[in-house]
Regions:
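Active-site-adjacent beta->alpha loops and helix N-cap segments on the catalytic face
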Residues: 1-18, 31-36, 53-73, 89-93, ...
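Generic alpha-helical hydrophobic packing signal
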Residues: 13, 43, 70, 75-76, ...
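Short beta-strand/loop segments at the ligand-binding rim of alpha/beta enzyme cores
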Residues: 16-29, 74-83
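Flexible, glycine/proline-enriched loop segments at strand-loop-helix junctions
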Residues: 22-23, 59, 106
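Catalytic cores of alpha/beta
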Residues: 30-41, 82, 86-105
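Non-cysteine beta-strand/loop elements that form the S-adenosyl-L-methionine
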Residues: 43-50
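Extended, intrinsically disordered, low-complexity segments
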Residues: 122-128
């Protein structure tokens, strides 16, 4: 539900009518959400919320060689944007190889505290 109890389907139809030339990206958490966004006609399908919602906690986008992304790519007509936990060059390369239109690298390059934590976590495990 959206504000005022409106369903996504109805909300998106209204917005699409009001802004017919605007590109719309769906930030999704599950394969089901991505398939639904594709059916609704979102221009871009994002994996942005995988692992970040109550229903997907503990899910990692890279599991089983990016099974979520592979499942979506086989079943949608709109471009898929890999976003969320794409935090290494190897992951970015792999999602492009699988067929994603683009990849978004967020926190791992834009938040110094995240970058620093990755280094300190690795270094605190070093035995002297």
């Amino acid at each position: 539900l959206r504000p005022n109890g409106e369903f996504l389907d109805d909300f998106f139809k209204e917005v699409r009518l009001k802004y017919p030339d605007q590109l719309f990206m769906a930030d999704c958490a599950s394969v089901q959400e991505m398939l639904h966004a594709d059916e609704l006609g979102f221009d871009l399908i994002g994996t942005t919320l995988v692992g970040y919602t109550d229903d997907t906690t503990g899910t990692h986008i890279e599991e089983d060689d990016f099974a979520i992304i592979r499942a979506v790519l086989k079943n949608v007509t709109h471009p898929v944007i890999a976003e969320g936990n794409i935090d290494t060059p190897a992951k970015a390369k792999r999602v492009i190889e699988l067929g994603c239109f683009s990849v978004v690298i967020g926190s791992s390059i834009t938040r110094p505290q995240v970058i620093t934590k990755r280094f300190t976590d690795a270094l605190t495990k070093v035995e002297k």
